[in-house]
């Protein structure tokens, strides 16, 4: 007789870390990845385990509106809302990417009430590495 395979819940059913096993997180790391087309905000604990995340796409913005500063602000607010409920007091902010949502996401994080220990820019900059692609002619 065939074994029944337990159903694995999808991400839409609930956030990771939600439910009965909510742990207190006094200090965390907020990663903001801002590209020209989207902004992804991930909140981890100090060891790097993901507690909550959100992006402009999951916040309801589609198409070109995902790259706007308002979409980045909404994504940052959605990602931080769950960790504030879990008791996060202090956080480090690591920002990566050249997108428009960098400043808007940082402004939303500052308004959330979490004390920021430092803000670091980790945007990758080539030291004359690979040749960039040719310029577009429109």
UniProtKB/Swiss-Prot annotation:
Q: What is its main location?
A: plastid
InterPro entries per the UniProt record, alphabetical: Ribosomal_uS11, Ribosomal_uS11_bac-type, Ribosomal_uS11_CS, Ribosomal_uS11_sf
Keyword set, alphabetical order: Plastid, Ribonucleoprotein, Ribosomal protein, RNA-binding, rRNA-binding
GO MF term list: rRNA binding; structural constituent of ribosome
Record's GO cellular component terms = plastid; ribonucleoprotein complex; ribosome
Compartments where located: Plastid
Q: Please give the superkingdom of this protein's source.
A: Eukaryota
SUPFAM superfamilies xref list: Translational machinery components
The GO annotation for biological process reads:
translation
Annotated region Disordered: the residues are 1-22
- UniProt-listed HAMAP family: Ribosomal_uS11
Annotated family: Belongs to the universal ribosomal protein uS11 family.
Description of how the protein assembles with itself and partners? Part of the 30S ribosomal subunit.
Q: Which PANTHER family match?
A: 40S RIBOSOMAL PROTEIN S14/30S RIBOSOMAL PROTEIN S11 (PTHR11759)
What this protein is called in its record is: Small ribosomal subunit protein uS11c
Organism, per UniProt? Cuscuta reflexa (Southern Asian dodder)
């Amino acid at each position: 007789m065939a074994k029944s395979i337990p159903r694995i819940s999808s991400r839409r059913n609930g956030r990771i870390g939600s439910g009965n096993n909510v742990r207190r997180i006094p200090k965390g790391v907020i990663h903001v990845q801002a590209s020209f087309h989207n902004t992804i905000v991930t909140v981890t604990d100090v060891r790097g385990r993901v507690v909550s995340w959100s992006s402009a796409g999951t916040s309801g913005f589609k198409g070109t509106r995902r790259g706007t500063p308002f979409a980045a602000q909404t994504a940052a607010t959605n990602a931080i809302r769950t960790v504030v409920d879990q008791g996060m007091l202090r956080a480090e902010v690591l920002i990566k990417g050249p997108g428009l949502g960098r400043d808007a996401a940082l402004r939303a994080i500052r308004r959330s009430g979490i004390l920021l220990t430092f803000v670091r820019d980790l945007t990758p900059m080539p030291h004359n590495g690979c040749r960039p692609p040719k310029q577009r002619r429109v």
